[in-house]
Each structure stands twice: as structure tokens, then as C-alpha cells.
């Protein structure tokens, strides 16, 4: 029996209308053999958490450039926990000031990937940190 594929939800919360980076990451994860669900633009934390629950994902990747990471990301983590998804990794990618990273990690974000991070690094992080179970 083979291990099931890692399932990742890639989400764009808030009013940010730039999704090129999220689409690049989604394609890279697919190319690496992961199942990827892309939510599209302008998602609320509630929409993201609901999609994560419905899709039974292992990780949620939040692409954010709007500067609202300090409110949106902790809210997404909170909603996932409320839905019993404590083991779901939450990753953030985008423009996040270095000084905000500790606050995000304290709120439950597993990792923050800044501009210039290679897609290989993101794939490796997911493979190393998602607890895979056999189908």
C-alpha cells in the first residue's frame, strides 16, 4: 500500500488581487506529486477554514501581500483549531516583515516563506512536516 498524497489548500485571503505567486506555488506542489486545491482570490478566513475542512487537507498555504497577515493568519489558525484541525500545517508566503514572523509562529503558523524562497524549499518543508498516514 502506498502513502497517500499530501493535500494542500492554497488560499488568498483578504482584498489582495495579486495571485501569480499563489498559482506558481500551487503548480510546483502539483508537479511534486501533491494534491492542491486553490481557493481563488478574496477569501475570508471562514471560507478558507471551511474549504480546508471539506477538502480534508494536510496543510493550508496562505499567500498574502496585503499587509493584513497579523489579523488574517491567526484567525485562520483559530478557525482550523475550532474545527478539530490542530494537526493541519499552516504556512504563510508573501510579503511579511521579519519582525512579524515570531508573532505569526506564536499564533500557530508553522512557517513563513518570504519572497525569493525556492519552490523546492517549500516542497521539502511540506514533505518533512506533514504527518502522512497510509490510505
Name every feature range the model reports, one short phrase each.
Residues 1-5, 85:
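Short, flexible coil/linker segments at domain boundaries that flank nucleotide/cofactor-interacting
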Residues 22-127, 132:
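Cofactor-cradling patches in redox/metallo enzymes
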Amino acid at each position: 500500500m502506498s502513502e497517500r498524497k499530501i493535500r494542500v489548500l492554497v488560499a488568498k485571503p483578504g482584498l489582495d488581487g495579486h495571485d501569480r505567486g499563489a498559482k506558481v506555488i500551487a503548480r510546483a506542489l502539483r508537479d511534486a506529486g501533491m494534491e492542491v486545491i486553490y481557493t481563488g482570490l478574496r477569501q475570508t478566513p471562514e471560507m478558507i477554514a471551511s474549504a480546508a475542512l471539506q477538502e480534508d487537507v494536510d496543510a493550508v498555504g496562505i499567500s498574502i501581500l496585503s499587509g493584513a497577515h497579523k489579523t488574517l493568519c491567526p484567525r485562520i489558525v483559530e478557525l482550523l483549531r475550532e474545527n478539530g484541525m490542530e494537526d493541519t500545517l499552516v504556512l504563510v508566503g508573501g510579503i511579511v516583515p521579519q519582525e512579524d514572523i515570531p508573532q505569526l509562529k506564536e499564533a500557530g503558523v508553522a512557517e513563513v516563506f518570504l519572497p525569493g524562497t525556492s519552490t523546492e524549499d517549500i516542497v521539502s518543508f511540506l514533505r518533512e512536516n506533514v504527518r502522512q498516514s497510509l490510505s
